[in-house]
Amino acid sequence: MNLNYLDFEQPIADLEGKIEELQLVGSGNALNLSDELERLRQKSAKQTESIYSNLTPWQIVQVARHPQRPYSSDYISRMFEDWDELHGDRHFGDDKAIIGGVGRIDGKPVMVIGEEKGRSVKDKVYRNFGMPKPEGYRKALRLMEMAERFKMPVLTLIDTPGAYPGIDSEERGISESIAQNLAVMSRLRTPIICTVIGEGSSGGALAIGVGDQLNMLQYSTYFVISPEGCANIIWKTVEKAPLAAEAMGVTSSVLADLGIVDETIPEPLGGAHRDIDAMALKLKERLVSQLDRLQAVPIEELLDTRYQRLMSYGNSAV
C-alpha cells in the first residue's frame, strides 16, 4: 500500500522516498545496497517513533481522520467469522452510514454495529461520509434490541464526523433517534462494548457509544464538537482549530485520565493504517478478553454497574 503522509510526517516521507529510489536503483543493476537500505529503514523507524511520541492533540485529530485509516468494514472482515449483514430500520430505509449484523468473534455470537465513512469518492457519497441519518440510528437500535432478545453481546465501532445535520435528517427526527438510542442502550439487558476507532464526534458518536466498556484506539479522538467547529464559535475562525483541540481534551490519554475512557488500545507505530492486520488482531484480543469478563457478570449487576458508570461522568472534573 502506498502511504499518504500528513504534513507533519514530511521527514518520514522524505526518508521513505529515498528508500524507494534505492530499491529501484538496486533492482536495475548488480549493486548491493542492502546495508544502506537497512540504515535508512532504521532511520525512518526512529524518525517515526520520535514524531509519534510527541504528537499534539491537533496532529492526533489528523491521524484519526487519515484517509487510509481502517474503517469499521476493515475490522469486521478481519475480526469476525460467519458475518451476516442486516439492513433497514423497518420505518424508512437502510442508512449505508451504519453497517450492522451478526457474526462470531472467537466462536462467540455477537451483534456488531459500526459507522462507515467510505474509502473512494463514490463510496463516500454512498456512505454519506459516515454521517448517519435517523434511519441509521434506528437501524442500530433495531439490531441492539434483537441482540437483547437473542442474548448476544453488542459491539459497536465508532467513527463519524457527526450525525447528518441536513433538513431531511431533522424532519425525520435525528435528535429523537439519538436520544432514544441513549435511553435504550443505558438499560439494554446484554453486555455492550463500544470502541472509538477513528473520529468520535458529538451525538453521532454517542448514539452508539453507551455501554459497559468504552475503548479508544491510541490515535482516535472523541469530542462534543469538531475542533474546527469549536474554533469557529469561540474565535470566529477555523485557524484556531489546533488551539481548540488542545483545550477540549480530545485524545484518548486525556479522556482516560478523566475516567471517561476505560481502555486505550495501542496502535502500530505510525498509526493503525500502517498495519491494519496487526491493529485488527490487537483489537480482537482486547474485545475477546473484555467479553469474557462482562459475560461472567450477572445481568442485574451489569446494569447497575453501567448506571453507576454513566452517573459518575464528570465527577473527576468537579
Swiss-Prot record:
Similarity remark: Belongs to the AccA family.
Pathway: Lipid metabolism; malonyl-CoA biosynthesis; malonyl-CoA from acetyl-CoA: step 1/1
Gene Ontology cellular-component annotations: acetyl-CoA carboxylase complex
Protein's organism: Saccharophagus degradans (strain 2-40 / ATCC 43961 / DSM 17024)
Gene field: accA
Cellular localisation: Cytoplasm
Domain CoA carboxyltransferase C-terminal span(s) in chain numbering: 32-293
Task of the protein: Component of the acetyl coenzyme A carboxylase (ACC) complex. First, biotin carboxylase catalyzes the carboxylation of biotin on its carrier protein (BCCP) and then the CO(2) group is transferred by the carboxyltransferase to acetyl-CoA to form malonyl-CoA.
Protein name as annotated: Acetyl-coenzyme A carboxylase carboxyl transferase subunit alpha
Quaternary structure note: Acetyl-CoA carboxylase is a heterohexamer composed of biotin carboxyl carrier protein (AccB), biotin carboxylase (AccC) and two subunits each of ACCase subunit alpha (AccA) and ACCase subunit beta (AccD).
UniProt entry keywords in alphabetical sequence: ATP-binding, Cytoplasm, Fatty acid biosynthesis, Fatty acid metabolism, Lipid biosynthesis, Lipid metabolism, Nucleotide-binding, Transferase
Entry EC no(s): 2.1.3.15
Pfam families linked: ACCA (PF03255)
Catalyzed reactions: N(6)-carboxybiotinyl-L-lysyl-[protein] + acetyl-CoA = N(6)-biotinyl-L-lysyl-[protein] + malonyl-CoA
Molecular function via GO: acetyl-CoA carboxylase activity; ATP binding; carboxyl- or carbamoyltransferase activity
Any single biological process term in GO: malonyl-CoA biosynthetic process
Classification lineage: Bacteria, Pseudomonadati, Pseudomonadota, Gammaproteobacteria, Cellvibrionales
